[in-house]
Amino acid sequence: MLKSRLRMFLNELKLLVLTGGGRPRAEPQPRGGGGGGCGWAPFAGCSARDGDGDEEEYYGSEPRARGLAGDKEPRAGPPPPPAPPPPPPGALDALSLSSSLDSGLRTPQCRICFQGPEQGELLSPCRCDGSVRCTHQPCLIRWISERGSWSCELCYFKYQVLAISTKNPLQWQAISLTVIEKVQIAAIVLGSLFLVASISWLIWSSLSPSAKWQRQDLLFQICYGMYGFMDVVCIGLIVHEGSSVYRIFKRWQAVNQQWKVLNYDKTKDVGGDTGGGAAGKPGPRTSRTSPPAGAPTRPPAAQRMRMRTLLPQRCGYTILHLLGQLRPPDARSSSHSGREVVMRVTTV
C-alpha cells in the first residue's frame, strides 16, 4: 500500500511539472453512497473499473505520457521453476537402504581405528556389545602396548591371548617412556645392583676366615649396620616400584612378541559377575534361586573395593589408639584434646 501511495505521489508531481498547475484538480468523491467509501488509494485487489475511475479523478481526461500510462502494465517476472521429476525406483531402494543402515544395521567397525573388515579380521575379545564389540588384532595389541593393561577398560574382562613366539632381536621395537617411568627403571636397576653387591660382601665378611679381623673392628661393625639399613631401603624401593616396572615390561612384551587373540567364549567365562555397565555383555546365567543358608556369599566388586579402601584407614586408627593407650595416665589426660583431633583427622 505504501508503495502504491508513493508511486501516485510521484505521478502527481510529474503531472504538476508538465501541466504547470493550470487546471485545478477536483477533489475525489467517496464511492458507494454516503460514508460507504474508504477514501484511500485503490488496493491491488480492487476491480479494473474502480481503478479507472480513480485515475480519471486524479489525472483527468487529458492524455498522459507513456511513462505514466504504462504503470499499470504487468511486469514480467521470473518463470516458475520446473517440477522435479519423480525419483526412479532404484533411488527409493537406496534411500531405504541408507535409512536401514542408520537405524542400526551398520557394518561392524573396529572400536580403535574405526575401520571395517577390509582392514583385517574383526574379533570380539571381551564382553562388550554393540558398537564397541569388534576390534582388529593389531589395533588391540597396539592399545595394550600403550596402556600396559591386558583387560578391557569397559567390562574389565581379561583378554584371552596366546603367545606364539618372540620376535627376532633385530626386530625388537622400543616403547615410549615418560620421565617418571625412566626414573623408576633406573631406581630398580641401581637398587638391585647395590643390594646384590652389599649382600655378597656381608656374606663373605661374616663367613670368610680371612675377614675375621674385620668382624672384630669397630669401624667395620658400623659399616655392617649402615649396609644393612641400605639393604632394607633397597628392598622397599624394589617392592614399591616393582609393579610399575612390571607393567612397563608387559608393554614391551606386547610389542615384541607375536600373539593370537581369542574371541570371547561365554561358556569359559568364569568371572561374568565382574563385568559392569551397559556396554558389557551379561555373564553366564546363574540360578535365580537363593543360595543355602550356610553357603558363603561373595561380596560384589564395589563392596570389595570399599573394603580395600577402608582397611588402611582402620589399621592406622587402631595403631594410633594402641599408642595412645601405652602413654602414662598424666600425659594422656593432658594431651587428650590434641589426640582427639588427630584421631578424627585420621578417620576422615
From Swiss-Prot:
Pathway: Protein modification; protein ubiquitination
Keywords of this entry: Golgi apparatus, Lysosome, Membrane, Metal-binding, Transferase, Transmembrane, Transmembrane helix, Ubl conjugation pathway, Zinc, Zinc-finger
Subunit comment: Homodimer.
Record-annotated membrane-spanning stretches: 185-205, 219-239
Sequence ranges of Basic and acidic residues compositional bias: 63-75
Functional summary from the UniProt entry: E3 ubiquitin-protein ligase that may mediate ubiquitination of MHC-I, CD4 and ICAM1, and promote their subsequent endocytosis and sorting to lysosomes via multivesicular bodies. E3 ubiquitin ligases accept ubiquitin from an E2 ubiquitin-conjugating enzyme in the form of a thioester and then directly transfer the ubiquitin to targeted substrates.
Membrane topology: Multi-pass membrane protein
Binding residues annotated for Zn(2+) 2, in chain numbering: 126, 128, 152, 155
Iron found in the keyword field: no
EC primary class: transferase
Stretches annotated zinc finger (RING-CH-type): 102-162
Binding site for Zn(2+) 1: 110, 113, 136, 139
UniProt catalytic activity: S-ubiquitinyl-[E2 ubiquitin-conjugating enzyme]-L-cysteine + [acceptor protein]-L-lysine = [E2 ubiquitin-conjugating enzyme]-L-cysteine + N(6)-ubiquitinyl-[acceptor protein]-L-lysine
Phylogenetic classification of the source organism: Eukaryota, Metazoa, Chordata, Craniata, Vertebrata
MF terms (GO), sorted A to Z: ubiquitin-protein transferase activity; zinc ion binding
Domain notes per entry: The RING-CH-type zinc finger domain is required for E3 ligase activity.
Biased segments, Pro residues type: 76-90
Pfam families on file: RINGv
Location(s), subcellular: Golgi apparatus membrane; Lysosome membrane
EC number(s) from the headed UniProt entry: 2.3.2.27
Primary localisation category: Golgi
Organism encoding this protein: Mus musculus (Mouse)
Name the record gives this protein: E3 ubiquitin-protein ligase MARCHF9
